[in-house]
């Protein structure tokens, strides 16, 4: 009886795994009036409302912590500069995500030496002072950074990563049960899943955000070629990197090659915007 039960469970698990394997991870999207081609994640098991609510709470906490330490929006001219660039980029985002026009966008600057910036799901942008000052960014380069981060939100990479984590945990537990590996098996499978699933998706997200980011910049009238000089600056201050296979980001050289390959598709958009 027990053997029959185990056999039935394994048959069920096989069906679950096979069904998940048939689901498309992403589809390609390209704008009707030209531009880059990027992948739009399809395998979404976490509701968008859950992701946006979680991101909004985290963003609010970060703002409150920064404000309590006197680190939020301290340099008025710097904040005005960042917001002016973001305000030109944001309207272009509806081409990649129609819902972006309904987001409650926020743009803030933290007075921290960290070289960092991000855009959370729902349009919550944060730029760190160190990014601007240590790299001595031009407006075009700053637009490349902000455009890249906005692209992550537009393409719902945060939601995709959460969905991947949920599916990975479900899959690991099912596989451990299927193979009778117990806790040790679950741990080993989780580590394998981290390398085999999470990291490749993350690298593809970065590449797509780079490409969508230069298109956003180009359509907003910022020179997309500045993304190349931006990442050369990043490489200069970044020092050594982990082996590319184990990195969640493309290597700087690979990243620059991808951007340069995408420039011919967005330069006409930049020239058109600059002529207006």
Q: Language-model segments: which ranges?
A:
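Intrinsic disorder/low-complexity segments in short proteins, especially the signal peptide
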Residues: 7, 25-27
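Bacterial N-terminal signal peptides that target proteins for export
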Residues: 2-16
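A Zn2+-metalloprotease active-site environment signal
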Residues: 2, 27-276
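Bacterial N-terminal signal peptides
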Residues: 14-24
């Amino acid at each position: 009886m027990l053997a029959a039960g185990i056999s039935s469970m394994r048959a069920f698990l096989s069906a679950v795994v096979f069904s998940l394997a048939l689901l498309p991870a992403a589809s390609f999207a390209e704008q009707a009036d030209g531009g880059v081609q990027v992948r739009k994640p399809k395998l979404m098991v976490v509701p968008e409302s859950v992701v946006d609510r979680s991101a909004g709470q985290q963003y609010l906490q970060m703002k409150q912590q920064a404000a309590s330490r006197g680190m939020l929006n301290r340099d008025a001219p710097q904040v005005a500069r960042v917001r002016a660039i973001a305000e030109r980029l944001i309207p272009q985002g509806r081409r990649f995500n129609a819902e972006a026009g309904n987001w409650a966008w926020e743009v803030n600057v933290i007075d921290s030496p960290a070289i960092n910036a991000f855009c959370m799901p729902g349009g919550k942008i944060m730029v760190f002072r160190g990014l601007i000052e240590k790299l001595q960014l031009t407006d075009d380069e700053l637009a490349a950074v902000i455009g890249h981060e906005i692209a992550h939100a537009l393409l719902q990479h945060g939601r995709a990563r959460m969905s991947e984590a949920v599916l990975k945990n479900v899959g690991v537990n099912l596989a451990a049960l299927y193979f009778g590996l117990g806790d040790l098996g679950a741990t080993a499978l989780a580590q394998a899943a981290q390398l085999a699933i999470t990291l490749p998706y993350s690298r593809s997200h970065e590449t797509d955000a780079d490409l969508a980011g230069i298109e956003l910049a180009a359509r907003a009238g910022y020179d997309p070629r500045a993304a190349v000089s931006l990442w050369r600056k990043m490489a200069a201050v970044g020092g050594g990197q982990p082996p590319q296979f184990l990195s969640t980001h493309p290597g700087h050289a690979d990243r620059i090659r991808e951007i340069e390959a995408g420039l011919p598709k967005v330069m006409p958009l930049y020239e058109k915007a600059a002529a207006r």
